[in-house]
A protein has these predicted regions:
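Iron-sulfur-associated redox domains of electron-transfer enzymes in respiratory
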Residues: 1-147
């Protein structure tokens, strides 16, 4: 394993994508990146562009307005990538389920690797989901290197 591969293993880049949420989960994600929970101690960094992301956190029900944007953003994330569904909305629509503008669940449009449920989930639960995603990502990278 090269020095760069070792570094990448310990510093996953996360891209956050809101697909129409109430912002409850988004607030918890921002709290997670702040000094109280300090996700950076695990090497987690927030990516400004999906092109630099290893892990994508998706919040909110997939709305008809956000669907094409989400597909476009996900197409820019390099493989291997891990998709983390945050909150109950991406999985079920939650309170937005029967809305005329919801075109979910998220799994209808992309494979979800980790699901963090709750409305809204606590930062600790989101961090646990991210660490699970890091493990999945490292396993994928390990398989790539063995090919």
């Amino acid at each position: 394993m090269s020095l760069i591969e070792k570094g990448r293993k310990k510093s996953p880049w996360i891209y956050h994508l809101n697909t129409g949420s109430c912002n409850g989960c988004d607030i918890e994600i921002m709290a997670l990146l702040g000094p109280k929970y300090d996700a950076e101690r695990f090497g987690v960094k927030l990516a400004a562009s999906p092109k630099h992301a290893d892990i994508v956190l998706i919040t909110g029900p997939v709305t008809t307005q956000c669907r094409e944007r989400m597909i476009n953003v996900l197409s820019q994330v390099p493989e291997p990538r891990v998709i983390v569904s945050v909150g109950s909305c991406p999985a079920s629509g939650n309170v937005f389920k029967d809305s005329y503008c919801v075109d979910g669940p998220l799994e209808k449009w992309t494979k979800v690797d980790v699901s963090v449920v709750g409305c809204s989930p606590k930062p600790e639960a989101i961090l646990k989901g991210i660490l699970e995603a890091v493990e999945i990502l490292n396993n994928c990278r390990g398989q790539e290197n063995n090919v």
